[in-house]
Structures are given as structure tokens and as C-alpha cells.
């Protein structure tokens, strides 16, 4: 069983069930991918497969990556992803990976990079409560105290402060598959997934 597949986010829409209830869904163009490497217990001390997605010109990749892909007779692929597996039986290098093993009703975990929001303050980034807006107060959206005095004499690591918001890897678990179109490589899952349209996603099956 293929543990996962790579794809791109096409956008969100809604579908209606038998009772007429509107369900928000995300449409994903998943695959086809190429199996570029098989790792075994004997050669790598663990079992995994590496798949590639999104064919590009050879001039877009560096020579080490092109050499790695040519070992598996794979074309120039922009994105590579590794998945751990319990067994590599029945899998072959250069094998084409599609949505054949994905079934309606099962759940998947979808990983991707969230939309970057740029530099943000603590109110927007961490939902800090703002200060009084009137009665002479000048502390409206300030972070407030960031620590103690001469003891410990430093700001503790991990303190919530202003900084970049978004643009980080995120995973949404237990998203139900509501539709699979193997002919057009379309996967429809219930709910939202990280990122904007065109974002690269990793779709991993819950039960491997």
C-alpha cells in the first residue's frame, strides 16, 4: 500500500450530501508521482520510499539531484518526499504512483506551508488582549512585560513576541476523503488544508 502522494492545492468549494447539507471541501491535484528510491533495512537501516512530483526542465535542477534521479530512470522532478513503510514488497523503482489506493470515507493527513502574513505584532500573532483604549492609557497593542528584573536577568527562550507570522510547515490530520477521480488525478477532502492555491501538499494515509 502506498503511504502517501504529493499534489497541489487547486482551491476550495462546497458539495451537498444526500440531506442537502453543504460540506466545505478542498480540491487537490494529487500525482501522478514517480517512485525514485527504495530504502531497505539492509542498505539504510530503515524502510522507506522516496517519490518525486512535478516534472521540470533539467536545467532547473542541480547536477547532484539530476544524477540521483537518473539512477532510477526518472525524469527531472522538482519535489521529492520520503515516506516510511512497513514493507517494500511489490514496489519498484520508477513505478508510477496514482490515487488507486485512496478510498472514499478514509482519512488522510495533509501537510503544507501556511500562507505567509509577514511581520506581525503579538495581538495578531498570538491573540494577546489589547490594553485600554481611553482614560489616558498609552498601552493599546503593546506586548507588555517580557520577564522579571535582575533575576534571572534575561528573556526566556520561546517568549511570545512580535515576528513573522505564517509561512511555516503545518499538518492537518483526520481529513475525510469525499471524492476520488483517478482518471484526472483529483482528490477531494473535507475541510481546509494549509496554504494558498498552487501550494505543494503531502497527502499521507492514516492507516499504512
Swiss-Prot record:
<dbReference type="InterPro" id="IPR009000">
    <property type="entry name" value="Transl_B-barrel_sf"/>
</dbReference>
<protein>
    <recommendedName>
        <fullName>Large ribosomal subunit protein uL3c</fullName>
    </recommendedName>
</protein>
<keyword id="KW-0699">rRNA-binding</keyword>
<keyword id="KW-0934">Plastid</keyword>
<comment type="function">
    <text>One of the primary rRNA binding proteins, it binds directly near the 3'-end of the 23S rRNA, where it nucleates assembly of the 50S subunit.</text>
</comment>
<dbReference type="GO" id="GO:0006412">
    <property type="term" value="P:translation"/>
</dbReference>
<dbReference type="InterPro" id="IPR019927">
    <property type="entry name" value="Ribosomal_uL3_bac/org-type"/>
</dbReference>
<dbReference type="GO" id="GO:0022625">
    <property type="term" value="C:cytosolic large ribosomal subunit"/>
</dbReference>
<dbReference type="InterPro" id="IPR000597">
    <property type="entry name" value="Ribosomal_uL3"/>
</dbReference>
<keyword id="KW-0689">Ribosomal protein</keyword>
<keyword id="KW-0687">Ribonucleoprotein</keyword>
<feature type="region of interest" description="Disordered">
    <location>
        <begin position="129"/>
        <end position="165"/>
    </location>
</feature>
<comment type="similarity">
    <text>Belongs to the universal ribosomal protein uL3 family.</text>
</comment>
<dbReference type="GO" id="GO:0009507">
    <property type="term" value="C:chloroplast"/>
</dbReference>
<dbReference type="GO" id="GO:0019843">
    <property type="term" value="F:rRNA binding"/>
</dbReference>
<dbReference type="GO" id="GO:0003735">
    <property type="term" value="F:structural constituent of ribosome"/>
</dbReference>
<keyword id="KW-0694">RNA-binding</keyword>
<keyword id="KW-0150">Chloroplast</keyword>
<dbReference type="Pfam" id="PF00297">
    <property type="entry name" value="Ribosomal_L3"/>
</dbReference>
<comment type="subunit">
    <text>Part of the 50S ribosomal subunit.</text>
</comment>
